[in-house]
């Protein structure tokens, strides 16, 4: 049984993330597992990263339910220590195959002995979380940060 891990901050969960989760599901197969690991899980609300871990988890679960995709969601707190990140994260998401489109993350996991499935995303430039967050803020006509969330 293959266990595939998709790691990200998901601020917010967007189409690029959806493509990664679908690729993980395909790689895991019918008998496998998909784990979505939410980074920066300790982070509280802030204007640049407006969703809490529970809100990000709700986005992911709602999407997965609509897509009929079974997955596990776990949170991972930041430790700001790249050399020890993989060991720290593995305690939360378990062992498996990392499915990612992020080269630095892929390199970090491979250096720790992980198998990594790289996924090419054709719209990476437009499907970056910071662009999505900026667009949402620009489209909002509400100036109260709590209301805009």
Where are these regions (language model features)?
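Nucleotidyltransferase catalytic core that binds NTPs
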Residues: 1-149
């Amino acid at each position: 049984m293959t266990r595939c891990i998709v790691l990200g901050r998901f601020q917010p969960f967007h189409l690029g993330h959806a493509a990664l989760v679908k690729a993980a599901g395909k790689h895991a197969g019918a008998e496998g597992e998909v784990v979505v690991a939410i980074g920066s899980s300790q982070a509280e609300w802030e204007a640049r990263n407006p969703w809490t871990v529970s809100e990000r988890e709700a986005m992911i679960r709602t999407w997965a339910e609509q897509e009929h995709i079974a997955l596990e969601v776990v949170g991972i707190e930041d430790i700001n220590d790249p050399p020890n990140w993989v060991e720290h994260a593995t305690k939360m998401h378990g062992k498996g195959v990392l499915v990612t489109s992020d080269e630095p993350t892929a390199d970090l996991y491979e250096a720790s002995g992980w198998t990594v499935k790289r996924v090419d995303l054709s719209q990476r430039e437009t499907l970056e979380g910071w662009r999505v967050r900026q667009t949402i803020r620009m489209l909002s006509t509400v100036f109260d940060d709590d209301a805009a969330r």
